[in-house]
Each structure stands twice: as structure tokens, then as C-alpha cells.
Amino acid sequence: MTQNENPSAQSGAKPEDKARPAKALQGVKGMNDMLPADAPLWEHFENAARAMLRAYGYQQIRTPIVEHTQLFVRGIGEVTDIVEKEMYSFTDALNGEQLTLRPEGTAAAVRATIEHNLLYDGPKRLWYTGPMFRHERPQRGRYRQFHQLGAEALGFAGPDVDAEIILMCQRLWDDLGLTGVRLEINSLGQAHERAAHREELIKYLEGFKDILDEDGKRRLYTNPLRVLDTKNPALQEMAANAPKLIDFLGEESLAHFEGVQRLLKANNIPYKINPRLVRGLDYYNLTVFEWITDKLGAQGTIAGGGRYDPLIAQMGGKAAPACGWAMGIERIIELIREEGVVPDAVGCDVYLVHQGEAAQQQATVAAERLRDAGLDVVLHATPDGKSGSFKSQMKRADASGAAYAVIIGEDEVAAGVVQVKELRQGAQAEGGGQQAQVPAENLVDYLIDAMVGASE
């Protein structure tokens, strides 16, 4: 190529193409980022949830995001909406296995319990949290990736534990300051009772074939209970007059349900019996429940659960009773916002302001010593690597939410001192909010004493 030849001209590329910035990539629709501004609300929820779970003696379990597809087909039910049309499934290119991004947490928790023989020494109370995935149209309160908190009480058969898992939710609502969340409960009885009801229900629904929507027709013979869970306004009267499962329950199932209600009443938990409440998963029996709010529109269910005694044996484990709940964290975060609950602002303890190379070095050492003492410290830094003026740095310090600013310049380095300035109301540095000069070697003790004074 000669010196005058233009390689871009030979390739057909236009010179201006090289200067065109790359198109910014976007996240997947329905899979949302949690940004720093959202973090205080999430931390507020997570801290309250962990404290509540600890109060009831639940231990955390963590399972993989990806499981074998068959786990959910067998665990959730082959004719459920989740398995039929909402799962993110794929074939593993390495070995041809059918795998799925988990759409819910109970099946995986039960799988882990069986695989690791967790019930060998008695019942267990477990909890989990993490992202779940469902392939559906994103809308308010319903996302393709969402976060779930769940609790599972494994190996307990009595209505006392059914009541306990409901009380856990109520305690969390109280701790979060949520109001207007109502409880609906029902009993699905046992398999033979549901079979007798199913026979009568199918006969009843066959008389309405002409008005059933597509979902109703599809479920009529595979999962008729779910037909009653319709949101179609045109089918509400039909659903309301359908044979009620509770009328088919035997003495044992009724006694269990009455036991749950008795304990809820004893704890002053108001509830409504909803005979059409069936939940969307096939593994439930006996008690089912939902916590509902009117403040989130159509997606008003913020938590739900119940008893699933057959599931452990159904998934290959030794038969054991079980019950639990799950709640959608994004919906609860939105409800916290609707309620106007404002968590305490989270700021650092100290913001370190510095100017000059020697001051930067001393500030770095001071920051590490303060962190060694357990303080949260932000060391000033800028995109261009220059420290900036003291005035601009102090603006950053104010905005950080720090209780104190520690200021180090060339004069301070030469004198072996630092300046400590109170930034936030309630900080108790000597001088009552004024700026104090402190020997550099005494900085840690000075700030710890000041912060102890602020907390008294």
C-alpha cells in the first residue's frame, strides 16, 4: 500500500463511521436493575425480614438458580400455568440435560432437603431468598425476573405450624409499618376429598362450556379447581355458585382447618374464608392462604402459601408433612413506597477531605485506621484524579450523609494534626458542631469518643 492510499476507502467504510459512538445496550424487558437510590428500601425490607425469621427460629438455605426442568414439572404440576408457559427452559449444550431457571423456591428447597437428608434428625424450619424467573408479559408488580422471600416448615403436621407461618407474615407487615393488608384462607382438604369435589365440579362446569374462556376450557378436565380462580368478570357468578370444596371435607380436614382458625383468632388475626382460593401450584393440600392489598392494582397478592404434605414423597423423599409461604419482594417494596414509609438515611461515619500529595497519603492511612476501628469511611476521590478545592470537597462531604468530615491539607501534615468538623445534627464533637483541631495520632480515639457521646 502506498503512503497516499486510504484503507477505509478500499473497505467501503465511511470515515465518519469510526467516530460514531456505539449504541448503548439496554437491560432485558421485565428484568430490572436495583439502583443505589432503591437500596435503602431493599435493606429496610431485608433487615426486617431477617430479624423476623430469626425470631421464629428459621435457618437460611441457598439453592442454585438453575435446576433440572423435571424438578418443576414434578413439583409444581404439569398442567399449571408456570410449567405450561412461563418457564425459562433450555437444553444444556454439554450433556443434553433439560434445565430451567427456577420459577419459584419451594421445589428447590425440598429437593435440597431430600438430597442432603436434612430431616434425618427431625423437622426443620428453613428460609430462602433470591431471584426467580417467569416468561410472561411484564407489567406493574409482575416481572420476568423477580425476587422472592420464602419460608418452609418441613416435618410439622399440626395446625399450629400453619398458624405460625401466617403469624410470621403479620409480624413482618407490622415491623415494616404496612397497613391494609388482608388475609384470605381456605382448605383444599386431602386428595380423596378433592377427587370427589372434582367430579361434581366438572359436571357443574360442563354446563357452562359455552361461556368458558380459553383458559377455562383448557383447565376444565385437567385442573378444574383453577377454573374457579378466574379473573374474568363474565365468569364470576358461575364461579361463585360452583360446588364448594369445603362441603366435601371430612372430619379430619375440617378439624385441621378449625384448629388453624382457632389459633388465628387467639392471636387477633382477622381473616376471611375464601372458598375459591386454590393457589396456582398443584402441590398444596389442607390450608392455603394469601395476603392481599388493594393498593397495587391487579397484582394485589403480596404473599401466599399453605400446606403441601404430599410434595416431599412426590419428589422421591421419605414422606413428611410440610408447609410454607413465599412473598414477592418487588411488590412489597412498591407497597412500602405507597405507604410512604421512609427508612432512615444510610450515610457513612466519616468523609476524608484532603489536598496535596502528602495529605492524600496521610488521608489514606487515616481512613484505613478508622476502618480498623469499625467506622464507615469515604475517602474523597474524583474522576480526573485531582482532589479539587476544599470548598468542593466539603460539598461532597455534606452530600455523603457523613457525621464528620476529617480535613487534611499541607499545613495539617506539617503540624501533625487534622481538622474534624461536625456535619450532621446529633454528632457530638467537642465544640458542639464546630471545627476542632486534633492531633493526627489521636484521631481514632477522638472520633470514637464523639460517636459514643452522640449515641447516649
Curated annotation (Swiss-Prot):
Annotated PROSITE patterns: AA_TRNA_LIGASE_II
EC id: 6.1.1.21
GO cellular component labels: cytoplasm
Name this polypeptide is given: Histidine--tRNA ligase
Enzyme class at the top of the EC tree: ligase
Location within or outside the cell: Cytoplasm
InterPro entries: aa-tRNA-synth_II (IPR006195), aa-tRNA-synth_II/BPL/LPL (IPR045864), Anticodon-bd (IPR004154), Anticodon-bd_dom_sf (IPR036621), His-tRNA-ligase (IPR015807), HisRS-like_core (IPR041715), HisRS/HisZ (IPR004516), HisRS_anticodon (IPR033656)
Region of interest: Disordered: 1-22
Catalytic reaction equation(s): tRNA(His) + L-histidine + ATP = L-histidyl-tRNA(His) + AMP + diphosphate + H(+)
Taxonomic source organism: Cupriavidus pinatubonensis (strain JMP 134 / LMG 1197)
Principal place of residence: cytoplasm
Gene Ontology MF term list: ATP binding; histidine-tRNA ligase activity
Biased composition regions of type Polar residues, renumbered to the chain: 1-11
Keywords on record: Aminoacyl-tRNA synthetase, ATP-binding, Cytoplasm, Ligase, Nucleotide-binding, Protein biosynthesis
Subunit description: Homodimer.
GO BP field: histidyl-tRNA aminoacylation
Family stated for the protein in its record: Belongs to the class-II aminoacyl-tRNA synthetase family.
